[in-house]
Structure formats: C-alpha cells, structure tokens
From Swiss-Prot:
Binding residues for Mg(2+): D14, H133
InterPro entries: Glyco_hydro/deAcase_b/a-brl, YdjC-like
Organism taxonomic ancestry: Eukaryota, Metazoa, Chordata, Craniata, Vertebrata
Protein's name in the database: Carbohydrate deacetylase
CDD domains: YdjC_like_2 (cd10806)
Active site annotation, chain numbering: D13
Domain of life: Eukaryota
EC number in record: 3.5.1.-
GO process terms (BP): carbohydrate metabolic process
Length: 313
C-alpha cells in the first residue's frame, strides 16, 4: 500500500450529549465517516456513549467542558466557575468571567481533574487525547492549567485550533469570523505552553470553516487542500520537531473537527440544563450525511488521505 499523503483524524465531538447524537455518531463511525470521538463526561448521556464506544471499539478522548451545564466535581458549590443557578457560565459567559479576572484557576484545575477521573470510570482507560469544549482549553491562564493536568495524567495529544486558509473564508458570517480569529490567536499563544509540557497535536487542524451547513464536498476539498499546501512549512509542524527535514518524508497529520448526529429533541439531552439550539439543528444530520457520503470517502482514497485516530499516532 502506498504511503498516505495525509493521516486524518476525523473527530466527532460532543459524544454523550444525548442518545440521538450518540447514535448518529456511531452510525457515522460504522460507515467510515469519522475515525475518532470526543466524550463530554458531564453530558446526560455520557454513560450511554461510553457503552457504545466499548461495544464498537471506538477510539475515544475527552472533550473537557468548562462552559456548558453542570460540573463533575462535587466540591464546586459557590465556585467562580458557576453562575447563581449552579451551571457553567456558557460559551461567551465563561470568557467574560475569565477576562474579568474572577475565575479561580484552582477551581478550573479541580474540575478538569474530576473530568479525567470520570472519563476513566466510564471508559476504563485514560483518554487518548483531550481538548476543550468550545475551545476553552486555549484561553489565557486556562491553557497553563490544562497543560499541567494533561502532563500529570500522561495524556499526550490535544487540539490546536488554527485552520490553514481560514482568513479567506468570507462566506462565514462576521460574528463567526470574529470568534474564530480570537480562537486562533489564543491557540497560537498556547503552542509554547503545550510544547513545554510535552503535549503534541496534529500538524494541521480543520473544522472551523466546515461546520453545519458549510460542510460539503467542495468545502472539505478546499480545507484539505489548504492543509496540504501548508505542508511541512507550518510553524506548528516545525515547533513539534527538532529535525524539520525528517518531516518531508512523513505524511502530514491532521484533525478534522465535526459534529454529526441526529438532532436532539426538545428537553432531551445537554449537560444538565437541556439541549441548545446547535444540538437541535438539522445541521447535525447534514454533517452526518456529508461525512458518510461515498463521494467524500472516495475523495479521501483518491487523494491519499488515510483516516485514523489519535491512538494510532
């Protein structure tokens, strides 16, 4: 078999969110559309997801959640991580509280450690990789605590959400372009922190420009071709190697973040406060159908793109 040009990890995020999402992720995995999953251990259907992962031998990591729903740690009552109702502050609320200087990093650390331990209880082994729900793991101050937790537990892979060519994706609405630009800035500033703690990541990250209705064969082609063009010249790749020349003779490694599934029903799913609009959208089904489309799978084969998982690294 010829050497692949790209070793692509296609990660289905938010495993555990609800049973319909879980089933959609499993169906996508069994059809060859994804090769890896990321578990929300504080989600209401996390146990259901864990049982499915073991049944179907799904490579699985931890999608650490500090922004949605209820905490795992039982010692966070009155915590700066939580609002007056006892829930996390939300995607933007978490960032606002962090930037105001009100978050205690000791509480962030306690919750991250509790989630790793819950993952082990559910799955029976440590996560093959660990990232952050809504990209919280690359935020200032959080990144240092996150990296230390991974180092302490021996978790060696994470996600660095910097997507080649993203700045040219003018089809994205302005609010998403603004959010994505900040995510990339935070991610770039996390590189040295992760590197210093012995944490690795794929050479290329994809997924910010291909979410929901923006996922289609032409858009996946564009994103993957941008990753190939980026190749070994990427500063993220060179950061991870003391011998950059050797990278010329190995495949590019990449992660594609995806969110397939069957849409959540009202009042079903979530992380303790019900499902959000994102989970109830038909965009989930659109991603599922696109990822398992024979045209997409054939494109991978034609381009020398081999689907794999973090554990294969």
């Amino acid at each position: 078999m010829p050497q692949p040009k790209v070793k692509l990890v296609v990660t289905g995020d938010d495993f555990g969110y609800c049973e319909r999402r879980n089933q959609g992720i499993v169906d996508c995995f069994r059809a060859g559309g994804i090769s890896n999953v990321s578990l929300l251990v504080n989600a209401v259907s996390a146990k259901h997801a864990a049982d499915l992962a073991k049944r179907y031998h799904m490579p699985i990591g931890l999608h650490a959640n500090l922004s949605e729903g209820l905490p795992v740690s039982q010692e966070l009552k009155g915590s700066t991580l939580l609002n007056k109702d006892g829930f996390f502050h939300g995607k933007m609320g978490f960032r606002e509280v962090l930037h105001s200087g009100q978050l205690k990093m000791s509480e962030v650390e306690a919750e991250l450690r509790a989630q790793v331990n819950r993952f082990f209880e559910l799955i029976g082994h440590m996560p093959y990789h660990m990232d952050g729900h809504q990209h919280v793991h690359v935020l200032p101050d959080v990144r240092e605590v996150f990296a230390q937790v991974l180092s302490d537990f021996g978790i060696t892979y994470t996600r660095v959400p910097i997507e080649p060519g993203l700045r040219f994706c003018n089809f994205l609405p302005s609010h998403l372009r603004e959010f994505n630009a900040q995510v990339e800035k935070d991610a770039l500033e996390s590189v040295e922190v992760f590197h210093r703690n012995g944490i690795r990541w794929p050479d290329v990250y994809l997924g910010l420009s291909t979410m929901g209705k923006n996922m289609c064969l032409s858009n996946l082609k564009r994103a993957l071709e941008a990753s190939l063009d980026d190749g070994v010249s990427s500063p993220l790749i060179l950061t991870q190697s003391n011998n950059a020349a050797s990278n010329c003779y190995r495949p590019v490694t990449a992660e594609l973040m995806v969110h397939p599934g069957y849409p959540s029903q009202p009042q079903q799913g979530g992380c303790g406060e019900g499902p959000d609009d994102f989970s109830q959208s038909t965009d989930r089904l659109h991603e599922l159908n696109t990822l398992r489309d024979p045209m997409v799978l054939n494109f991978y084969r034609q381009q020398g793109i081999h689907l794999c998982a973090f554990k294969d690294f």
